[in-house]
Amino acid sequence: MTEHFDARGTRDAQTGRDLHSFIAGLPKAELHVHHVGSASPRIVSELAARHPDSSVPTDPEALADYFTFTDFAHFIKVYLSVVDLIRTPEDVRLLTYEVARELARQQVRYAELTITPFSSTRRGIDERAFMDAIEDARKSAEAEFGTVLRWCFDIPGEAGLESAEETVRLATDDRLRPEGLVSFGLGGPEIGVPRPQFKPYFDRAIAAGLRSVPHAGETTGPETVWDALTDLRAERIGHGTSSAQDPKLLAHLAEHRIPLEVCPTSNIATRAVRTLDEHPVKEFVRAGVVVTINSDDPPMFGTDLNNEYAIAARLLDLDERGLAGLAKNSVEASFLDAAGKARIAAEIDTYTAAWLAP
C-alpha cells in the first residue's frame, strides 16, 4: 500500500491554522508530472470502455487494485497498459484537457507536462494530429482554467534508441514542433538503460533550444545522476533519489543550483524508497540542494500535488512560509519566462501574507 500523509487537522504551531487549507489554496507550479500517468480513474475508465480489448479495468474502484505496484518493473508494465488506451487524437485531447482541469483544481498556475509522443505515434496516431491535439487542449485549458501548460518530450528508455531518434525528430522538426514545447527528457527504467547512450539525442535537442531534464537516480545509484549531468547536460534531475548516497554529488547539485524534482509518494509506490520517513528529501535540504515537490503519476499512486506538499510539510517541518518557499522553488526552477515567474511568485507572496494576516 502507498503511504499517505493528510495535513487536515495538522495545525501550525505559531498560527494555529490548518495547513491543509493553506496548501489547497497555495498557488503552485509543477515540474514533474506525466501526461498519461495523470489520467484520472474516471478518464482511464472512459478510455478503457472505448477500447474494450484492453486489460485495463473499466470500473474505477477496480483501478485502485490495478494501480497497486509490487516494484518499479510492475509499475512500468501497468503504465504501458494505460498508454495503450491512447489511440486517437481525441483520446489525446481529452486526456490533456482533463489533466489541466485537475491541475487547476489544485491551484497549479504553471505545469511542465512530460509527454511521450513516441508511444502514440508508434500506435498509429498521425504526428500532426497528435501535436494539434495537445496544443488545442493546452490553449483551451489556459483560456478556461488559467493554467499554463508547457511540454517536455521524453524518450521512453524501455523502447531503446529507435524511440530516442523518433522523439528528437519530433521535438526538433520545425514543421511539427509544438509551440508549448520547452524541454527534452528521458524516462522509463534506469537499470540496463545507461544514460550516456542518449547523449547524441540530447545534444541535438539542446542545440534546438530545448532544456535537458532527464530522470536519473530513481532506481539506480548516484552514478546515473552524474551521467545525466555530464553526458546529458541536465539542468534539472527527475527524482535523483540516490543523490543522497554521494556527498560530492550533493555538493555539486547545491553549488550549481541544479534542482531535484522530488516525488515522495511515487518513490514509495515503486519501492524506490521503503518508507516516507526514510525519504532523502531531508538530506537534500540540509545539503542546500534546490528541492521542488511534484506528483509524478498522481492517480496511479493515489496522490495529488496538494498531498505531496502535505508530506513535505511533515518531513521538513514546514510552516506556511516554508511551504510558500517550496512553491517558489518550483516557480524559479521552471522554464517559464522571467515575467511569468515574477507574476506567480508575487501571487504566492500575496496569498501567504493574506493568510498570515492577523
From Swiss-Prot:
<dbReference type="GO" id="GO:0009234">
    <property type="term" value="P:menaquinone biosynthetic process"/>
</dbReference>
<dbReference type="InterPro" id="IPR032466">
    <property type="entry name" value="Metal_Hydrolase"/>
</dbReference>
<protein>
    <recommendedName>
        <fullName>Aminodeoxyfutalosine deaminase</fullName>
        <ecNumber>3.5.4.40</ecNumber>
    </recommendedName>
</protein>
<dbReference type="InterPro" id="IPR001365">
    <property type="entry name" value="A_deaminase_dom"/>
</dbReference>
<keyword id="KW-0474">Menaquinone biosynthesis</keyword>
<dbReference type="InterPro" id="IPR006330">
    <property type="entry name" value="Ado/ade_deaminase"/>
</dbReference>
<feature type="binding site">
    <location>
        <position position="188"/>
    </location>
    <ligand>
        <name>substrate</name>
    </ligand>
</feature>
<keyword id="KW-0378">Hydrolase</keyword>
<dbReference type="GO" id="GO:0016814">
    <property type="term" value="F:hydrolase activity, acting on carbon-nitrogen (but not peptide) bonds, in cyclic amidines"/>
</dbReference>
<keyword id="KW-0862">Zinc</keyword>
<dbReference type="Pfam" id="PF00962">
    <property type="entry name" value="A_deaminase"/>
</dbReference>
<comment type="similarity">
    <text>Belongs to the metallo-dependent hydrolases superfamily. Adenosine and AMP deaminases family.</text>
</comment>
<dbReference type="GO" id="GO:0019239">
    <property type="term" value="F:deaminase activity"/>
</dbReference>
<feature type="binding site">
    <location>
        <position position="296"/>
    </location>
    <ligand>
        <name>Zn(2+)</name>
    </ligand>
</feature>
<feature type="binding site">
    <location>
        <position position="34"/>
    </location>
    <ligand>
        <name>Zn(2+)</name>
    </ligand>
</feature>
<keyword id="KW-0479">Metal-binding</keyword>
<feature type="binding site">
    <location>
        <position position="32"/>
    </location>
    <ligand>
        <name>Zn(2+)</name>
    </ligand>
</feature>
<comment type="function">
    <text>Catalyzes the deamination of aminodeoxyfutalosine (AFL) into futalosine (FL), a step in the biosynthesis of menaquinone (MK, vitamin K2). To a lesser extent, can also deaminate adenosine, 5'-methylthioadenosine, 5'-deoxyadenosine, and 2'-deoxyadenosine.</text>
</comment>
<comment type="pathway">
    <text>Quinol/quinone metabolism; menaquinone biosynthesis.</text>
</comment>
<feature type="binding site">
    <location>
        <position position="215"/>
    </location>
    <ligand>
        <name>Zn(2+)</name>
    </ligand>
</feature>
<feature type="binding site">
    <location>
        <position position="87"/>
    </location>
    <ligand>
        <name>substrate</name>
    </ligand>
</feature>
<feature type="binding site">
    <location>
        <position position="154"/>
    </location>
    <ligand>
        <name>substrate</name>
    </ligand>
</feature>
<feature type="active site" description="Proton donor">
    <location>
        <position position="218"/>
    </location>
</feature>
<dbReference type="GO" id="GO:0046872">
    <property type="term" value="F:metal ion binding"/>
</dbReference>
